[in-house]
């Protein structure tokens, strides 16, 4: 058990200065003043702020990259890097390289991170179609593997499989059915590239098939102006979009253009590669994205419009669109995924471990 005394809570909403009792990895009680008749570990929160742990829904936990040959493969992420960024939940996935990287490797890494105290889930698939899987099918992965929350796919990208409208509908239908059977809120996380068709296939699939728009969740939606305009239209229709941050606050200008901000999440694309290409298609430049970008982006947004308005993009919104019932908020009965801040510095990360 732990007792945090006299701490300002943003849950994300402002709860004021409270005491928080943690028991069995859960938030047992939040009250103005908590006194116990027996001694337990007590943390003095005076002058500090308590928030939910951040959720990063786009992390290449086994390492991404590879577009510039084997030398460009990124290393797997370390658990301490995640915790140092104030992140207590991650979604691991594959990217361009679904050939030398595997879903089995992803699953094993997720188990490692979970055992070290970070909630870790994964997506099956990669950029390619048909999807590479852990079991014999996308459906079996979602139904039988608790940690698998959906499928990854690339669209409108020169590295994608350039699937057809019917293939997209077929894949989405399979995810939908498996999601219902598993009792999950499974989704199709769609890596969006720079090609001019942008979200065209997604719009066509939604129009043609009776599949909930919530199943389609495009990411990297600020990649270019045309894509972002289509992403805004997508949110107006009730869809969820994810914006990749760079740690320099660029997401702010995009968020300010969106009406339905509850359907917007921000992620890092950590341990994935960023790359630019020459006219002949060869790699011009490549680098690896650090997970610390998420914390930096949160601090930037928090300093612009406060904890209450900044936190949801990194916590509550993410939990809601992914179907997490007990994380993403500082609330009685929720998991004790918490971060203690003093100004812009993390003082302590508390997880289930």
Please state what every model-predicted region is.
Residues 7-9, 18, 24-27, 327-353:
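C-terminal cap of metal-dependent C-N hydrolases
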Residues 260-341:
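His/Asp/Glu-enriched, well-ordered alpha-helical/loop segment
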Residues 45-108:
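Metal-associated gating/positioning segment near the N- to mid-region
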Residues 96-107, 116-211, 225:
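Buried, small/hydrophobic-residue-enriched core segments of structured protein domains
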Residues 7, 25, 47, 58, ...:
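Divalent metal-coordination and catalytic microenvironments
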Residues 1-37:
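N-terminal metal-binding scaffold of metallo-dependent hydrolase/deaminase domains
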Residues 174-277, 283-284:
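Active-site core of metal-dependent hydrolases
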Residues 53-57, 90-92, 120-124, 149-155, ...:
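Hydrophobic faces of well-ordered beta-strands that scaffold small-molecule active sites
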